[in-house]
Amino acid sequence: MATLEAARKQIAPVSFDDAPQLRVLTCGSVDDGKSTLLGRLLFDIHAVLEDQLQALDSESRRWGTQGAGRDYALLLDGLSAEREQGITIDVAYRYFSTRRRSFIMADTPGHEQYTRNMATGASQADLAIILIDARRGVLPQTRRHAFIAATLGVRHAVLAINKMDLAGFSEARFDEIVAQFASAAQALGLRSVVAVPLCARDGDNVATRSDRMGWYAGPTLLEHLETVDVASDAQDISGFRLPVQLVARPDAEFRGYAGTIAGGAVRPGDEIVALPSAKRARIARIVTADGDRPEAGEGDAVTLTLDREIDIARGDVLAAAASAPEPVAKLTATLLWMADESLLIGRDYALHLGPATASARIESIHHAVDVETYAPRPATWLALNELGSVTIALDRKLVAAPYRDVRALGAFILVDRVTRQTVALGVVDALPLAATAPTATSVRPTQILRPARWALPLAAGAAMAALAGLLTHDPATTATLGLANVLVFAVARRIENLLA
């Protein structure tokens, strides 16, 4: 312990705003030590001021869970409910720098009921620190968090096996947990996974090497975070893309289109196409807070003016004319369902994809994901915190892209139209080739049975399916889907019709 404290004092505090940035997420099951780890890391790199330490000591005596010692988790858990219950509820962000790198750390909750908050933190992360309690090993919530992080584009992970003191600093236990997670890491497609044994409370292998685990020859957590290469994860986008967030009209002489460039680069004179209208123009100016620029690229917030006026609204996408994508009205996506009421086929929601919005209908559920094995399993609905693959039909065409290719055009949320609650987070997996707006299926009754078609809306369940089989050459489910698009049924009955 004395060696750890002496080593910590040799770490000088720094603040380099121009250092390369790494966005880090901590995740894992409840009570695995996520907040304690980040708090201890902040302490070890001298990112905690003296008055903050005094306040921490006072709060530790009142709220702490470490007896007479400091409770470093309180540096992150700021809500009164978090301190009273000793848990993390909301996402806490911390910003700090070392000589090598600047960091944005997102401390996320481990409780299953706050999974939506964890997903929020994962949506912008480059690397995930997956905490595991050395006594309990890999839990279902550990696997769920790892899957969500990977689904949201995180390609690098640290397997932080914490509370090694409670496992006797056992190398065998460390190796056992690493082996438990190995199959999951392979299934998730992670590019790098580094396992580090820790005692976050005491600082072992956090920022300084532990003398209590001499068998471990790898880097400390901080050493790995400072050196991990995430530059190779940059998106490879063929052509310029800018979702329009605002049409700027400060006066009668200026009309510009503001947004953050999602990919590619743009220069004055470049030909662009506005989607979905397909109107063309050329870039006249690239305006920023620092004045006009000769060029702008991915991640730059700009306002573009054009050489002629065309109809462009918030939610449209400006794209390079030579590589413009095709707007679509159907998506295949992975959803994280975040509402108490289950997701059902046929339900309508408001879809928000960046600044663009559309009415969306769940057309089909392909499968749910088993969080234990990551294998698909049959499903007709998704319950709270379940993940699954679905097809979504839109009422109008939007510009979208697979999330793995363009994050800004591949992530969306679904909102309940009545409660205005966000009910799902989704990422686009694929764009079907025949992506057209949903329409009612054409039903072709025979001349003899034509009068009977008016009885169809009054039937339900198996009766609906049987009648549909008589009245059309199409499969019963196809017929009922078309009718459900144009007839006003109770939600439960419409779902019954589709599943009959």
Question: What is each PLM-predicted segment?
Answer:
Residues 430-500:
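Glycine-rich phosphate-binding loop of ATP-dependent small-molecule kinases
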